[in-house]
Amino acid sequence: MKVISNFQNKKILILGLAKSGEAAAKLLTKLGALVTVNDSKPFDQNPAAQALLEEGIKVICGSHPVELLDENFEYMVKNPGIPYDNPMVKRALAKEIPILTEVELAYFVSEAPIIGITGSNGKTTTTTMIADVLNAGGQSALLSGNIGYPASKVVQKAIAGDTLVMELSSFQLVGVNAFRPHIAVITNLMPTHLDYHGSFEDYVAAKWMIQAQMTESDYLILNANQEISATLAKTTKATVIPFSTQKVVDGAYLNDGILYFKEQAIIAATDLGVPGSHNIENALATIAVAKLSGIADDIIAQCLSHFGGVKHRLQRVGQIKDITFYNDSKSTNILATKKALSGFDNSRLILIAGGLDRGNEFDDLVPDLLGLKQMIILGESAERMKRAANKAEVSYLEARNVAEATELAFKLAQTGDTILLSPANASWDMYPNFEVRGDEFLATFDCLRGDA
């Protein structure tokens, strides 16, 4: 980590804790800043705030009092989940207080080069794939960012010989100014998080910030399956490397069932360790990064063939009586579930879906539901999901929660069938996050296996 003096004796407000806020507070304190943390969770229910107080960091909990900004802060570090129309943020902007993001703070002190991965779907899987391949090739890749390891924490142990492989959400990118990865990947762009950004155009603009400071010596890897990529590619200074499952491109591509990089065959699609057309896209993006990083073809192929997926992201959980279970709780929109379904035989598939609708067009899912053996539907979006099932002429049952849905699916399943949790909706109507939803699926699998 570079020791910089930019924040020495500067009064800085951390707005919102969670993992990233806690990490930013500790990093800034190490850099000599005068840190105040403000979090909406009450102090007696806030272990992170309690721990920071024990380290001598000022904490204010229970609300976000706007008058706190009268204390002449010189910077604000905003939690990514707090929108820019929050009264505290609006007041800070009105007072012309610079607002930093936690990932940009990490960038300022990083000795290690950064590979940044963003997109609507596939971020975590691609980030993990890239780190696995780089490490298998003898490099030192450190996972960081939106994948659960705050960048401002990981950067403190990173040295110049490491590489930070950083998953980045639109929330994290919307406020960056100086952030510059050496390699950036945009997996795809679909209308998600519109409740936060307001429009698809603003959402894309946030994602596009990943390349704002890149130059021709940097590499931007784009999904050539999407028309928007061609439009965006014209506006970047970075060297663009495309990937595609639909056509031969001057980068990574799928042709006759083989994944290539610039005419060099790397691996057969059937040899990939995870199913689904979306995972072919993830693997192509990974191949592009790996080749730019000097990893040998045989190592790339071996690593991708053994890659077993990421928890909650088309995760192969196991089998009970030759019935296979997959946990894809991370699929919180239609596109993610469409891509998950592409990897299975619908006639042997029982799909568990439903949750909180965040503006999905459920008719878009109908072609992918055709021929399904059964659906188990749950959540706030149940009526809309049922209409889609009816249009696809798929029979369905309703469940009160994921546990009940999994039990119902298992009762209906026969030898050789697959049970897939791929909700196509957010989790917040029933669960605090997709991880808790997926964990309930995993726990139910364990119970069913124990009873079998």
From Swiss-Prot:
InterPro entries: Mur-like_cat_sf, Mur_ligase_C, Mur_ligase_C_dom_sf, Mur_ligase_cen, MurD. GO terms for molecular function: ATP binding; UDP-N-acetylmuramoylalanine-D-glutamate ligase activity. GO terms for biological process: cell division; cell wall organization; peptidoglycan biosynthetic process; regulation of cell shape. ATP binds at residues 119-125. Pathway: Cell wall biogenesis; peptidoglycan biosynthesis. Coiled coil: none annotated. Its EC number is 6.3.2.9. It comes from the Bacteria. The keyword Cell division applies. One of its GO terms (cellular component) is cytoplasm. It is an enzyme of class 6 (ligase). It is found in: Cytoplasm. Keywords: ATP-binding, Cell cycle, Cell division, Cell shape, Cell wall biogenesis/degradation, Cytoplasm, Ligase, Nucleotide-binding, Peptidoglycan synthesis. Pfam families: Mur_ligase_C, Mur_ligase_M, MurD-like_N. It catalyses: UDP-N-acetyl-alpha-D-muramoyl-L-alanine + D-glutamate + ATP = UDP-N-acetyl-alpha-D-muramoyl-L-alanyl-D-glutamate + ADP + phosphate + H(+). The keyword Glycoprotein does not apply. Belongs to the MurCDEF family. HAMAP family: MurD (MF_00639). Cell wall formation. Catalyzes the addition of glutamate to the nucleotide precursor UDP-N-acetylmuramoyl-L-alanine (UMA). This is UDP-N-acetylmuramoylalanine--D-glutamate ligase. It comes from Streptococcus pyogenes serotype M12 (strain MGAS2096). The lineage of its organism: Bacteria, Bacillati, Bacillota, Bacilli, Lactobacillales. The gene is murD.
